[in-house]
Regions:
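Alpha-helical structural motif
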Residues: 6, 18, 86-88
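Non-catalytic ligand/cofactor/substrate-binding and regulatory segments of enzyme domains
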Residues: 17-29, 74, 84, 122-134
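...with weaker cross-activation on analogous glycine-rich loops/strands in unrelated enzymes
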Residues: 54-123
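N-terminal capping segments
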Residues: 12-59, 98
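Sec-dependent N-terminal signal peptides
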Residues: 4-13
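Intrinsically disordered, low-complexity segments enriched in small/polar residues
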Residues: 39, 49, 58-60, 71, ...
């Protein structure tokens, strides 16, 4: 009986995710330039899509604390093409102590603003990690 309930709960969790709703939220709240709150904007979008997780203080923590993996994302090598809902987490460095986080809308990278590419730092570029849902 308990196994049945656990399976039912996992089924409900998996099927309650709406990536289109997450992206719609992200697109509708994006600014033209950075506000400095990339992780909060991407986290808000994930919540709008039905994801449940503990918010982190910094973007890099969504990778290092296993938050993205805990909600069904897996780390991947840089793909030849991106899929809607892919996430990048850029490591922190001395110039950017919180790192950076963004989501692929299907046509562009968006965090708290609409980006030109997945790379947001002009110099001293730390490693970028790629995550895909499912």
């Amino acid at each position: 009986m308990n196994k049945f309930i656990i399976c039912l709960c996992l089924f409900a969790f998996i099927h309650s995710i709406n990536m289109d709703a997450a992206i719609k939220h992200l697109v509708s709240h994006a600014h033209t330039s950075s506000t400095g709150y990339c992780a909060a904007y991407v986290a808000d979008a994930l919540v709008a899509g039905g994801f449940k997780f503990t918010r982190q203080a910094s973007a890099y923590m969504y990778r290092t604390n296993g938050i993205l993996k805990g909600i069904g994302y897996r780390e991947i090598s840089k793909p030849s093409s991106f899929k809607k809902g892919d996430i990048t987490v850029t490591d922190r460095n001395s110039a950017h102590p919180h790192g950076h986080m963004a989501m692929w809308s299907g046509s562009k990278w968006i965090s708290d603003f609409v980006q030109r590419s997945e790379f947001v730092y002009r110099s001293n570029q730390p490693p970028v990690h790629y995550f895909r849902y499912g």
